[in-house]
């Protein structure tokens, strides 16, 4: 039993014990309630960052808490190991992605163990291993057979530098988010999965996600984007072709003055054949940024095609324009334009001098001036012939019915969600298991040829994927015929869409999942990860779960019961200007600062003696060189201190500001806890607690102990406000200082320290492990039981009332909790110390705060 708290000697020994005992190995137990806790698995980039530490500490706290509450806990870990960064690193370091990835996995695995995270390492998986992606390939072929997979040529964002397709979200200012290369538009064949077949269910089931943050649910609803509207068909003057549009505002239909079409629309391409100027404009549009989020702010450009659409209801001819804000891969690639009642249409019409026709006015207002600005609210129709006077819904129904009766319209439900393009033109990913035969027929790779292995011993030239460059790799046979493998690889969101399920049976080789194990553990009870994954990973995982269900592999509808989105970790960022005026960012660990009385930085100097500029607290990032190395912090302060700071400094879902003084404060608290426990134990074995024999003061301390147990249990288990739980424990420790050294004081201290150690154990498990032994407990704290608040102890039978005379304290009374004001006054007036100050005075007024204060006003 060492007197000083030295985490560097404690923590490795405790971790070794956990490893040897396989403390956190999970097995299916029917006699215990299961709890599956999962943090989003990391990409093996090489080193953990503080964002990882926060995510995984939160998950570990929840897991350990549930284990102490008698649950059978599964907390696995693995590696989201495919992806472009490995290719870039391989090129930079003159190696192949595979060895770079495997080395990083080993290094980061040791870092995770150093943090004391209670994982079942026997379930570790890496998505780049064939025994993982084999089943992903198998499942893809089954989806193909069910008609849920198809291939089509589509316009994509193409990064010519990385030779890959980019999602709209990966294009920033018309450049690649990774390498800043200008993005081009390119037509290529791609594989898609029909997520739109599940759009309605994905939307409706959001209502069942009771344990998810409202913000994430709202983001998914908006991303799926269900709308009710009308598909309308316009005849084209002089042609047999028709132009299809979709609108959610058929009430504005009589205000259509032009039709906008995408640059890639067949009518645009047809018109361009005889119009070189239009052809050049279409080419310009094809290489314009197409992120939907930027459509509202981008400059609107267009050109007339010379074609005219015929308005189905009034026969008017309206011009057809190619417009850069109309996207071919959204909807029909054409829009009806109502500049009087749509901001974008108005901006375009004003720029090009097109007609602006008002057809909606406020219910109780004047006619809108639509020449200056579009009137976008709903209202009453005018200027609309037989539909004049109708409000929105009656107008919607009447115009939709009229169009349907004429055979040129149909009510329809539309979704913003598009099918999931899973093809990637990169190497380090799972090969897509499809074959093309000599006659062009496309077939899935037969099951006995799976997995389609990705060769790992490759040379990266930075230009083309090695499997695209290697003609021999693509060659294979199918039923004796020559066949060629698909050389695209899967979007890495494929791997992360089902990994949570594979953890249930990671070594199962008879199928994608062992249904018994999967249905024992799933759904995940608690999932932890960043809110940036709300609309991609979390939606794809929900979709995949429904696919697994419909394949008979799982019997639940949703993958994750409860979701916690942790906030970012921020740190101070410092820079100085170089000779060219550029910012040179300096690590905060290399900067000494001076602060004012409010803690604000007033001066900062780096290790070179150079004064640097403080740019504020920003997200830890490589670009600003303000990441704090978790390994360095663990080596300096210990894992428990880092974990305690992470859980205490901020609510879990809010941003966390890194603070050296905060970390030091966390370590001071742990040292104090160690010292108090050591002193308590050094005085000998504590006697048994006799609740009936406790004094008023001892009862008050015990009441605070059990109130704290109740609060911490609720804060950690239900509310997940871990910072307030820690604050309550710290306050309790201050109250324990009131205890003396008599037998019942020591007995009460023993009860309190045992409770404190167990309550802190999920957050600071190493010191908890040692202090539990120090307190003389036989079993490991890993198998202890979470303390239960004693309801009787929390009942206040007595209150301490302060007695004041004319606002000055003159005495204290211990009174029954339910005493009346009259009885308190009698006791006060009978108290000698009070009488001394009231003799000869007349009581004018009595102010009573029940159970706390009695103020007698007398003169």
From Swiss-Prot:
GO terms for cellular component: cytosol. One of its GO terms (biological process) is leucyl-tRNA aminoacylation. Transmembrane segments: none annotated. A motif ('HIGH' region) lies at residues 42-52. PANTHER family: LEUCINE--TRNA LIGASE, MITOCHONDRIAL, LEUCYL-TRNA SYNTHETASE. ATP binds at residue 622. It comes from Aeromonas hydrophila subsp. hydrophila (strain ATCC 7966 / DSM 30187 / BCRC 13018 / CCUG 14551 / JCM 1027 / KCTC 2358 / NCIMB 9240 / NCTC 8049). This is Leucine--tRNA ligase. A motif ('KMSKS' region) lies at residues 619-623. Pfam families: Anticodon_1, tRNA-synt_1, tRNA-synt_1_2, tRNA-synt_1g. PROSITE patterns: AA_TRNA_LIGASE_I. Its EC number is 6.1.1.4. CDD domains: Anticodon_Ia_Leu_BEm, LeuRS_core. Keywords: Aminoacyl-tRNA synthetase, ATP-binding, Cytoplasm, Ligase, Nucleotide-binding, Protein biosynthesis.
């Amino acid at each position: 039993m060492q007197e000083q708290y030295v985490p560097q000697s404690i923590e490795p020994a405790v971790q070794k014990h956990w490893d040897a005992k396989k403390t956190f190995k999970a097995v299916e137990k029917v006699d215990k309630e299961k709890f599956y806790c999962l943090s989003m698995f990391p990409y093996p980039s090489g080193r953990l960052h503080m964002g990882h530490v926060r995510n995984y500490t939160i998950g570990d706290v929840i897991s350990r808490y549930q284990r102490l509450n008698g649950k059978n806990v599964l907390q696995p870990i693995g590696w989201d190991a495919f992806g472009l960064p490995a290719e870039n690193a391989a090129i930079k370091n003159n190696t192949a992605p595979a060895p770079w990835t495997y080395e990083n996995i080993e290094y980061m695995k040791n870092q995770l163990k150093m943090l004391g995270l209670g994982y079942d390492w026997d379930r570790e998986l890496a998505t780049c291993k064939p025994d993982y992606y084999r089943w992903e390939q198998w499942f893809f072929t089954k989806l193909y057979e069910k008609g849920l997979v198809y291939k089509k040529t589509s316009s994509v964002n193409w990064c010519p530098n990385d030779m890959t397709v980019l999602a709209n979200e990966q294009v920033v200012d018309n450049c690649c988010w990774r390498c800043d290369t200008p993005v081009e538009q390119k037509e290529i064949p791609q594989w898609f999965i029909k997520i739109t077949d599940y759009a309605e269910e994905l939307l409706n089931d959001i209502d069942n996600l009771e344990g998810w943050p409202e913000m994430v649910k709202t983001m998914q609803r908006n991303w799926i984007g269900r709308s009710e509207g009308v598909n309308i068909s316009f005849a084209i003057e002089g042609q047999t072709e028709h132009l299809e549009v979709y609108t959610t505002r058929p009430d504005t239909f009589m205000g259509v003055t032009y039709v906008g079409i995408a640059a890639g629309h067949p009518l645009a391409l047809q018109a361009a054949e005889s119009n070189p100027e239009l052809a050049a404009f279409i080419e310009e549009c094809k290489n314009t940024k197409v992120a939907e989020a930027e459509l509202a702010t981008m400059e609107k450009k267009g050109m007339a095609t010379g074609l005219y659409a015929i308005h189905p209801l009034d026969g008017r001819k309206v011009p057809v324009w190619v417009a850069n804000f109309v996207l071919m891969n959204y909807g029909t690639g054409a829009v009806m334009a109502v500049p009087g009642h749509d901001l974008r249409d108005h901006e375009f019409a004003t720029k090009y001098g097109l007609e602006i026709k008002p057809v909606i006015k406020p219910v109780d207002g004047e006619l809108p001036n639509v020449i200056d600005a579009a009137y976008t609210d709903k209202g009453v129709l005018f200027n609309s012939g037989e539909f004049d006077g109708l409000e929105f819904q009656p107008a919607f129904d009447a115009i939709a019915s009229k169009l349907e009766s004429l055979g040129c319209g149909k009510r329809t439900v539309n979704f913003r969600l598009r099918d999931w393009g899973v093809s990637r033109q990169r190497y380090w990913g799972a090969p897509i298991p499809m074959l093309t035969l000599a006659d062009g027929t496309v077939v899935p790779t037969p099951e006995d040829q799976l997995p389609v292995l990705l060769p790992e011993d490759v040379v990266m030239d930075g230009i083309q994927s090695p499997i695209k460059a290697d003609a021999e790799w693509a060659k294979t046979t199918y039923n004796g015929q020559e066949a060629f493998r698909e050389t695209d690889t899967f979007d890495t969101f494929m791997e992360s869409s089902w990994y949570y399920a594979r953890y249930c049976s990671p070594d199962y080789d008879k199928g994608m999942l062992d249904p018994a194990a999967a249905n024992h553990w799933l759904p995940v009870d608690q999932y932890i990860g960043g809110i940036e994954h709300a609309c991609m990973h979390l939606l794809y995982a929900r979709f995949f779960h429904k696919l697994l269900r419909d394949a008979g592999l799982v019997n639940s509808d949703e993958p994750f019961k409860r979701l916690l989105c942790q906030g970012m970790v921020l740190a101070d960022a410092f820079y100085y200007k170089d000779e060219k005026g550029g910012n040179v960012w300096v690590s905060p660990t290399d900067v000494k600062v001076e602060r004012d009385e409010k803690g604000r930085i007033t001066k900062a100097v780096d290790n070179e003696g150079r004064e640097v500029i403080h740019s504020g607290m920003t997200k830890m990032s490589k670009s600003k060189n303000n990441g704090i190395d978790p390994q360095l912090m663990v080596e300096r302060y210990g894992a428990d201190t880092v974990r305690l700071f992470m859980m205490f400094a901020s609510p879990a879902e809010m941003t966390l500001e890194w603070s050296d003084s905060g970390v030091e404060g966390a370590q001071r608290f742990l040292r104090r806890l160690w010292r108090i426990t050591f002193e308590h134990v050094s005085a000998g074995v504590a006697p048994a607690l006799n609740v009936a024999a406790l004094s008023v003061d001892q009862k008050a301390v015990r009441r605070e102990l059990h109130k704290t147990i109740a609060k911490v249990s609720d804060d950690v288990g239900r509310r997940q406000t871990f910072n307030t739980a820690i604050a309550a424990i710290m306050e309790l420790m201050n109250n324990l200082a009131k205890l003396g050294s008599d037998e019942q004081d020591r007995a009460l201290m023993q009860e309190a320290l045992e409770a404190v150690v167990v309550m802190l154990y999920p957050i600071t498990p190493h010191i908890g492990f040692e202090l539990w032994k120090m307190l003389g407990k036989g079993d490991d704290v890993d198998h202890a039981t979470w303390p239960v608040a004693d309801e009787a102890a929390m009942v206040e039978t007595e209150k301490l009332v302060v007695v004041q005379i004319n606002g000055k304290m003159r005495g204290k009374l211990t009174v029954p909790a339910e005493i009346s004001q009259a009885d308190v006054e009698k006791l006060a007036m009978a108290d000698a110390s009070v009488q001394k100050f009231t003799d000869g005075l007349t009581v004018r007024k009595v102010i009573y705060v029940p159970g706390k204060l009695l103020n007698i006003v007398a003169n």
